[in-house]
Design a protein with these regions (language model features):
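Positively charged n-region of N-terminal signal peptides that target proteins for export
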Residues: 1-5
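Bacterial N-terminal signal peptides
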Residues: 10-17
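Sec-dependent signal peptide cleavage junction
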Residues: 18-28
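Short, well-ordered beta-strand elements
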Residues: 28-39, 80, 90-93, 112-115, ...
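N-terminal lobe/hinge region of extracytoplasmic solute-binding protein
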Residues: 35-86, 117, 189
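Gly/Pro-rich hinge or "lid" segments in bacterial periplasmic/extracellular proteins
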Residues: 70-73, 161-240, 246-247
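Aromatic- and charge-enriched surface segment that lines or borders ligand/interaction sites
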Residues: 80-125, 138, 144, 248-253
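Surface-exposed binding/hinge segments that line
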Residues: 83, 127-175, 193-200
């Protein structure tokens, strides 16, 4: 129960950092310190199933083609729309234009295809669902997947799987460590409102605001689940690795 409560508090902290109306932005701290009860093995969300990694990075640093609203429904995130055939065997995604990665490069179909095909290799359940089929580039802003059978749960997996179908630039996929199979920490590069700036193992993780973030959704509406307009009003989020529950609680109560 304590762990679930702590995860909820982390999620609420992130929502506060991202979703306050602009009129209140002047009241934001430059840095928010967050105590995390553990660290991810890698923060590579294609392979890592830890709650810590997902809570920290999903929707903040890393984004997906589609994501989940609060009611569990699926909504576009890095795509502006998508088509699914009546028999759920053909999927086409139309990407948002002008989305930038944290390395300054614009996201295109090549990045999405490289990311999702690597995700399939990492995530056995999704790989079994699609068989030998793989995502392909149609043009710079269109991606498709065509199967010889129905895959009715594919969108749900793309939006909400524990091994998240996040989108990296091609360079991150090419940099995968041959020994560990992980994307190196220096290549945890996404499209979200925060950048993965530093990981001091067993000490802290530092996220910093990405000023070129391409927001989507209505700025006058609150975030709906993981979907909606996000703006990083707080410049820095610092996650301290504090495994002792009493120490975390005391830090919360003291305002640290």
């Amino acid at each position: 129960m304590a762990k679930k409560l702590f995860s909820l508090l982390m999620a609420l902290t992130l929502l506060a950092a991202l979703a306050l109306p602009a009129a209140f932005a002047e009241d934001y701290l430059d840095i928010i310190n967050i105590a995390d009860d553990n660290q991810s093995a890698s923060y590579d969300l294609h392979k890592d199933t830890s709650v810590n990694g997902r809570n920290m990075l999903r929707g903040t640093v890393m984004e997906q083609l589609v994501t989940l609203k609060a009611d569990g429904s699926i909504a576009p995130e890095l795509c502006e729309s998508y088509d699914v055939s009546d028999d759920n065997s053909a999927f086409t995604f139309y990407l948002r234009k002008g989305v930038k990665f944290h390395n300054g490069k614009e996201m295109t179909s090549a990045d999405v295809v490289a990311s999702l095909n690597r995700w399939l290799e990492c995530f056995g359940t999704a790989r079994k669902m699609v068989g030998d089929a793989r995502f392909t580039v149609v043009d710079d802003y269109t991606v498709s997947l065509t199967l010889d059978h129905s895959a009715i749960m594919l969108l749900d997996m793309l939006a909400g799987a524990a091994q998240a179908a996040v989108i990296y630039p091609v360079e991150s996929i090419e940099a995968v460590n041959a020994d560990t199979g992980y994307v190196p920490a220096d290549y945890i590069i996404g499209t979200g409102p925060y950048m993965f700036k530093e990981w001091a193992v067993d000490q802290y993780v530092l996220l910093e605001r990405f000023d070129d973030y391409a927001a989507y959704g209505d700025p006058d509406q609150p975030i709906d689940g993981l979907w909606g307009y996000k703006h990083a009003y707080t410049k820095t989020l610092k996650y301290w690795i504090v495994k002792d529950a009493a120490t975390r609680f005391n830090g919360l109560m003291s305002g640290e």
